[in-house]
């Protein structure tokens, strides 16, 4: 949420740096919050109500013993923003996957990101151990089936796109084709430019035939507070079980979309935070607001790290043998699966979603990409035996990778540093606490 995150991070910085918390300062903070929310297209009435609550609480409530006034003011801002985005109503919501075969139906208008969301949701559930399949049910958009097939190949799940002109039949036959090999079948339905009667009839008939356990509306965050109207209309038409909001990373109106949907009572279950198939998060207002304010979300950071460690089984194997550049390459591959560095830094307290994250992550992302390009220019023998890399080989690798000899030497220095860490762990000089790969990652990020 470009702009919005920066604004909120600045508010946090202002509160933390304040020496006196008096009525004038509280009103100044309230005005800053108002400005941030209005620029994010949050409904004016909601903004005014939230402003009054923040001001009233900040001036009337006494902080608990030992808690500085500035910390308590930040807590009030945090709690009220969480409430604005759904509060406890959307806390810890899971999708219903209690049956042997669970059907998830994605609905929405054209251009909202349904097909991409289908693949992202497949990847998300796949990582949780489910066998997922995708079904195309859009006979109107010529490239829809091919797009879904390509995405299914990317996330490595089966896909079925029936060659008929009827959307309902495509859904029915697709679910039937995949039900024996999948725990979860995600149906990517057709959209329209608006919620017309024919779309409503089509979705209702489809729902009657395939009996979905979840009906998720996919909404683009760029529509802002209009998202609430869309959610209400679709809910009336097909009884939604939840909402997925896409493009939240780039939408200036993301705050408006989130708050408008939360106001309808339709649970926001997932948010899309980037273009990669890994960029889908279960929506939790508390951790989401914590990251926007720059106070971190350690639980999410740990979850992502653990997920990567579980996925990369070779990490433990590294400790049993010689650590080579090939091992380093595989660990950088594993690191890239955690998502872009700026996403990871958002979970770290004090980083937030502002400019500081983008500055640091840009340097780190460039370094990791450069390292991979350099190693792609090495032979298998060089990756397995880095000690043979003499001056002439380094020069050849630099030319082949379009980098400098200095860049290649920098990579080799990082490799030797990591190798020393691995050897210390192998010898027992460093205990295996916190994960050896985590230490490698920290060394890479430290640069």
From Swiss-Prot:
Pfam families: SRP54 (PF00448), SRP54_N (PF02881), SRP_SPB (PF02978). GO terms for cellular component: signal recognition particle. GO terms for molecular function: 7S RNA binding; ATP hydrolysis activity; GTP binding; GTPase activity. Its EC number is 3.6.5.4. GTP binds at residues 108-115, 188-192, 246-249. The keyword Cytoplasm applies. The keyword Hydrolase applies. It catalyses: GTP + H2O = GDP + phosphate + H(+). Keywords: Cytoplasm, GTP-binding, Hydrolase, Nucleotide-binding, Ribonucleoprotein, RNA-binding, Signal recognition particle. InterPro entries: AAA+_ATPase, P-loop_NTPase, Signal_recog_part_SRP54_M_sf, Signal_recog_particl_SRP54_hlx, Signal_recog_particle_SRP54_M, SRP/SRP_N, SRP54, SRP54_GTPase_dom. This is Signal recognition particle 54 kDa protein. The lineage of its organism: Archaea, Methanobacteriati, Methanobacteriota, Methanomada group, Methanopyri. The gene is srp54.
